[in-house]
Amino acid sequence: VGGGTHIYDPQSTLIDAQRPYLMTIGENVQITHGVTILTHGYDWSVLKGVYGDVIGSAGEVVIGNNVFIGTGSIILYDTKIGSNVIVAAGSINNVIIGANSLVNKSFPDNVVIAGNPAKVICTLEEYYKKRLSIYEQEAICLVKCYRKKYNKEPGYNELHEFFWLFTDSNDELIPLYKHMNELVTIDKTNEKFKQNKKKYKDINDFLKSVPWGE
């Protein structure tokens, strides 16, 4: 966090502390009442409830210098805000509702809705396929940011939302990974995990695949 940055109402402000190495806040950033800044999301719980997969999420949040963030704004992961920016205030079954959405009518099942006013932006199946397609890249981003911050490799805990990349039903799961598989739904996940074909032999194989210094 750069100099001259102020959080005016810390009690109402939520800044994601789970992965601090994914967040950079510049100088003279003014963070007002009710602001939320996230470096991960738990919307994958809906996908897990329907499909069974653990498809974690992670992404950088970079806020430049001389930025004003208005009341009630929500900044999601994988977001970069440049310098000299003003962020305006206030920025169903198996439904994912995007941050800061205004829902003022009924919506069908199995959709993702967002906006003010809210509208359907895609089906749950489309969102599921999208998450699968970028899941590994988000894990790689996490590794690179962790290395940059701490100059060492992330471990089992840091990669707990991405362990399906390097773990399958033939491996003995650590308690944290067992817990992840038991969230939301167990039976669907157990069946899906039996079918999971890990891309990497183990966590070290995955980490070796990510070049240092990029």
Question: Model segments located where?
Answer:
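Short beta-to-alpha loop/turn elements within the nucleotide-binding domains of ABC transporters
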Residues: 79, 100-101, 107, 116
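Catalytic binding pocket for nucleotide-activated donors in carbohydrate/polymer assembly enzymes
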Residues: 109-114, 125-126
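Conserved metal-binding segment of the jelly-roll/cupin
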Residues: 72, 90, 98-100, 106-107
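Terminal amphipathic alpha-helical/low-complexity segments used for targeting or macromolecular assembly
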Residues: 118-214
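Flexible, glycine/small-residue-enriched loop-and-beta-strand segment within the central core
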Residues: 3-81, 89-94, 117, 123-125
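Conserved acidic donor-binding loop of glycosyltransferase catalytic domains
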Residues: 104-105, 123
